[in-house]
């Protein structure tokens, strides 16, 4: 067994400001029972979190949700993050964004805005978002972000209902003069895991989409267009797991709306007691808490991970995925072909070939559905 690696610094702080959101995306990574979570942190409590994380080495902060724009103190939080020396990111649907708020955020020192789209087609986008005005608002705000001097960074979550239109998605991004485009195939956590049958593309769909993306990359390069296309494949079509979050509690720190501290944004579902910033400072949470030490190093590993010569590269894969698919977070990530549970992934691929679940049949992420799930 190699020596336990030194604990890294929490360089990347994800501030999940709220679970409130005007949209109802069926692939949202928020917890299914978000409606039953506790009271949101106050402005002053977030200031304390940001200051403590910065003292520990955090360099970049992402403001997300839910929809972070519903927080009326967002400009204050951005300004304080800037004062502390963070590189600041706003991760938003664009719903609730206005020219005036963009100007306020610019004045507060915001460095980066990423706007998410559900599809290139207005009808599909609005259906997935649960809002008839979502698409038009997103287009308007994407242009406004660019007009205020920000790079245009767009995120399209792709899945079986929109991935066959990847060419239209890319054409829309080119028309908008986007600088960076993330074509991120759905990752199956939270609501996406619940709706997997309606979201997981087939292998043929993925291969076609990646081929078309590569063709557009070549075309953009030949034309001297600086637009960068980033294509992200789902774990379910890999044979080896990802080094999730660069290792458990090693780089990435999430603070949820109620102050729960997590080593990744999906960890809340695990049967692990995670600390809260209302009760402990971040130094204690990061270095001493049980939750953040639970899957550090290699001692927790079972076979085949324990004796695997790749464990220092992938850390056994994703603990949340292992828990969701096998019921035990200490098991190998079933994505790995060496896992005795890899058949779960193979079965999911097979089911994707014949799945018939329509968009309208999926369970949408909203308060009503969340309350039903929370009641069990």
From Swiss-Prot:
Pathway(s) it belongs to: Cofactor biosynthesis; pyrroloquinoline quinone biosynthesis
Family note: Belongs to the radical SAM superfamily. PqqE family.
PANTHER family: PQQA PEPTIDE CYCLASE, RADICAL SAM DOMAIN PROTEIN
Catalytically driven reaction(s): [PQQ precursor protein] + S-adenosyl-L-methionine = E-Y cross-linked-[PQQ precursor protein] + 5'-deoxyadenosine + L-methionine + H(+)
Protein name: PqqA peptide cyclase
EC nos: 1.21.98.4
InterPro entries per UniProt: 4Fe4S-binding_SPASM_dom (IPR023885), Aldolase_TIM (IPR013785), Elp3/MiaA/NifB-like_rSAM (IPR006638), MoaA_NifB_PqqE_Fe-S-bd_CS (IPR000385), PQQ_synth_PqqE_bac (IPR011843), PqqE-like (IPR017200), Radical_SAM_PqqE_MftC-like (IPR050377), rSAM (IPR007197)
EC top class named in words: oxidoreductase
Organism: Pseudomonas putida (strain ATCC 47054 / DSM 6125 / CFBP 8728 / NCIMB 11950 / KT2440)
Role according to the record: Catalyzes the cross-linking of a glutamate residue and a tyrosine residue in the PqqA protein as part of the biosynthesis of pyrroloquinoline quinone (PQQ).
One MF annotation (Gene Ontology) recorded for this entry: oxidoreductase activity
Cofactor note: Binds 1 [4Fe-4S] cluster. The cluster is coordinated with 3 cysteines and an exchangeable S-adenosyl-L-methionine.
List of residues binding [4Fe-4S] cluster: 21, 25, 28
Keyword annotations of the record: 4Fe-4S, Iron, Iron-sulfur, Metal-binding, Oxidoreductase, PQQ biosynthesis, S-adenosyl-L-methionine
